[in-house]
Design a protein with these regions (language model features):
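Short beta-strand segments
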Residues: 1-3, 26-29, 55-57, 102-105, ...
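Short, polar/flexible loop-turn hinges at active-site or ligand-entry regions and domain interfaces
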Residues: 75-79, 125-129, 285-289
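Short acidic/histidine-rich active-site segments
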Residues: 98-114
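A mobile, often basic/glycine-rich helix-loop segment
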Residues: 110-140
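Adenosyl-5′-phosphate
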Residues: 51, 82, 91, 95-100, ...
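ATP-dependent adenylation/pyrophosphate-handling site
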Residues: 1-52
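A conserved beta-strand->alpha-helix junction
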Residues: 24, 38-73, 92, 212-224
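Residue-level signal for inorganic ion chemistry
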Residues: 46, 104, 272
């Protein structure tokens, strides 16, 4: 799979040297959302190495049509919209007779390739580290009064952190780790609004009256790291947590299940155990230096891949889920969330869910990632737990969704048109 970024280009460059025939490369793009595309960069790399290049361009309709298949093959709820383009590019590969593909998962974790790593590092170094050294009662007071925002500096709270600022201050007061890995969708403060009062009471009762928190998962992995390597710095902690949580439970699970749904196998050369062992012993200062992410990987690949690839800004493999939710997917969200059998279990506060749906519809707040997670959970529950024949979206709900879109448009509730 080729994006034209450093990881996939390195794969193609090395494979080209070892193969007597052209490497087959595959790229996916979005018809109505070119800002997400890396088609031009992939084509340029394909020309550079003379690959047998293939492309697939998908639309929002392709998303709607493929959702039942994705829910079926994932087996469990999955909150990652990248499954959609991944399924289509996997099918493209299969159509060419390909049975095994090389992918770039693992490189960002091993060599500090994520923008969030840098953002969390800046937040840690410019305030968090100093605040965590204060006595508990002072940290609690700072968090409760909002002084934490002043101490950390509003400008230092990158977009994701601004959104989860209440939970960051809660973590500060409780002495919890700043970074919990990228595998979590809902933070603890958000969950206190999302779950119904009855659910929160049941969870507390099962946990001896104490609040049940996802931090228990983070804490156990972190304690294991610090027992083996007490000198681990902040970047090493973040990388370790992602290797233990996000990579295996989200990224590798995603790529394995979705590619196998198309009857192909994905292999991850960056996760060769010898390379992982080597990379984990590289000092943090060689992974992130002078504002350069993946510093040592860039140095190692100089002269092996084109300079323009090394210099281009990382885009990342994404999907225009926010834009799609401002269009026809918005009607599907409205229909499926509030008509799912899951609603009858009273796990969630659907008044709160209605609020975030309305915020998304009006374009006030980008709640797309949260809503995508809830949509997938609802569809998964209906299919696998309730045993409903196929999914309602695939078996007759389209007319209801179209009607809902038309109603919302006539109601003039702001935001983009949902058609």
């Amino acid at each position: 799979f080729l994006s034209g970024g450093i990881d996939s280009t390195a794969n193609v460059a090395l494979m080209s040297r070892m193969m007597s025939e052209p490497v087959k490369t595959f790229t996916v793009g979005f018809r109505d959302n070119p800002v997400y595309n890396e088609l031009d960069e992939a084509r340029q790399v394909a020309r550079e190495y003379g690959t047998d290049h293939h492309e697939v361009i998908i639309s929002q309709q392709d998303l709607l049509d493929s959702l039942p298949e994705i829910i079926f093959h994932q087996d469990e709820p999955n909150a990652d919209p990248v499954c959609v383009p991944l399924l289509h590019v996997s099918k493209l590969a299969k159509e060419t007779g390909t049975t095994v593909v090389q992918v770039g998962e693992g490189s960002d974790e091993l060599f500090c390739g994520y923008r969030d790593y840098v953002s969390y590092l800046n937040l840690y170094n410019r305030g968090w580290r100093q605040l965590t050294g204060l006595p508990h009662f002072i940290r609690k007071a700072i968090s409760a009064t909002g002084l934490g925002a002043f101490q950390l500096g509003a400008g230092q709270l990158f977009p994701k952190a601004r959104k989860m600022a209440p939970d960051l201050f809660r973590r500060l007061a409780q002495g919890e780790e700043l970074f919990w890995s990228g595998a979590f969708v809902f933070d603890e403060v958000y969950k206190s609004h999302l779950f119904s009062a009855a659910t929160l009471e049941r969870l507390a009762a099962r946990n001896s009256g104490r609040r049940l928190s996802s931090y228990s998962v983070v804490q156990s992995d972190l304690e294991r790291l610090l027992a083996a390597r007490p000198e681990a710095d902040q970047l090493q902690r973040m990388i370790y947590l992602d290797l233990k949580l996000r990579l295996p439970e989200l990224l590798l699970m995603r790529v394995d299940k979705v590619t196998m749904a198309a009857s192909i196998e994905a292999r991850v050369p960056f996760l060769d155990h010898k390379l992982v062992e080597f990379a984990m012993n590289i000092p943090s200062g060689l992974k992130y230096r002078n504002g350069q992410k993946k510093y040592i990987l860039h140095r190692a690949l100089q002269g092996h891949i084109p300079d323009w690839v090394l210099k281009r800004k990382k885009k990342g493999f994404g999907a225009p889920i926010n834009e799609w939710m401002l269009q026809r997917l918005g009607g599907m969200i409205d229909h499926e969330l509030f008509n799912s059998s899951l609603r009858g279990r009273q796990l969630f506060d659907y008044g709160f869910i209605r609020q975030i749906v309305e915020q998304q519809r009006r374009g006030q707040v980008n709640n797309s990632f949260f809503l995508w997670a809830l949509l997938n959970l609802s569809l998964w529950y209906d299919h696998w737990i309730e045993g409903q024949p196929s999914l309602s979206w695939a078996s007759g709900a389209r007319a209801a969704v179209d009607e809902e879109n038309a109603r919302l448009q006539l109601a003039g509730q702001g935001g983009s048109r949902l058609v």
